[in-house]
């Protein structure tokens, strides 16, 4: 069972929330031109494709993981991405991440080991330390270590006390950290919201629809002609039609 999500357009509703959010303006036109072709190839391979416009591809995968993980027919859900925002989706060993670059599977214990907090605190962590890949600046002086130290104790940004003298954990430069957070707490909460993946994308497919039954010969032949690679047809081991 496979689903593939794409940012059909790179802008999303998050750009309306924050002007600095990623836009794709730095993506080379030659790369952008390949996006529609890749979507067509995925569909021709017989995969379920979710092309996102208002939401992001990450939201589609988070929604699918949330929707299908309780299904007793599902043994495990593997999100094939090393992106740290997906860590918030991990649940025990039932919903895990696959870092294909390092060929590593990250379960809930792995999230704690890698980021210092549980999955539920990942949006807070990114809200504090920022996420340059998504254009989230974070709060000055709040790096991963200090953010994880406080969130391991308090779980959420909202729960971090304003007075650093009342913190029950030690953090280097606590006074400065507190001053920066208190002067930008609203911004931190906005960044947290930006980093929170949506689990309510209106996906219409059922678990049965996600079952891979083979590539679609006609569709793939058309794409192969377009890109000038007939060899792709020879590499297909299973056809749906």
State where each predicted segment sits.
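Noncatalytic, basic helical substrate-engagement surface that gates or grips nucleic-acid strands
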Residues: 1-80, 85-96, 100-105, 187-190, ...
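Non-catalytic nucleic-acid-binding/docking modules located in mid-to-C-terminal regions
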Residues: 3, 70-73, 102-241
């Amino acid at each position: 069972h496979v689903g593939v999500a794409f940012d059909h357009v790179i802008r999303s509703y998050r750009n309306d929330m924050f002007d600095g959010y990623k836009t794709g303006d730095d993506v080379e036109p030659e790369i952008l031109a390949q996006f529609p072709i890749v979507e067509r190839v995925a569909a021709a391979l017989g995969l379920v494709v979710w092309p996102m416009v208002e939401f992001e591809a990450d939201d589609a995968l988070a929604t699918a993981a949330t929707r299908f993980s309780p299904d007793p027919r599902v043994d495990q859900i593997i999100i094939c991405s090393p992106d740290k925002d997906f860590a918030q989706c991990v649940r025990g060993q039932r919903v895990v991440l696959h870092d294909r670059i390092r060929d590593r599977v990250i379960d809930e214990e792995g999230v704690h080991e890698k980021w210092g907090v549980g999955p539920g605190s990942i949006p807070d962590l990114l809200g504090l330390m920022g996420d340059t890949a998504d254009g989230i600046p974070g709060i000055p002086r709040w790096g991963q270590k200090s953010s994880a130290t406080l969130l391991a104790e308090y779980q959420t940004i909202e729960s971090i006390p304003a007075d650093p003298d009342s913190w029950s954990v030690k953090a280097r430069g606590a006074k400065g950290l507190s001053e920066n957070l208190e002067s930008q707490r609203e911004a931190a909460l906005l960044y947290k919201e930006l980093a929170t993946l949506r689990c309510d994308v209106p996906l219409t497919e059922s678990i049965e629809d996600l079952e891979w039954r083979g590539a679609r010969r006609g569709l793939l032949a058309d794409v192969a002609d377009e890109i000038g690679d007939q060899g792709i047809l020879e590499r297909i081991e299973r056809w749906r039609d």
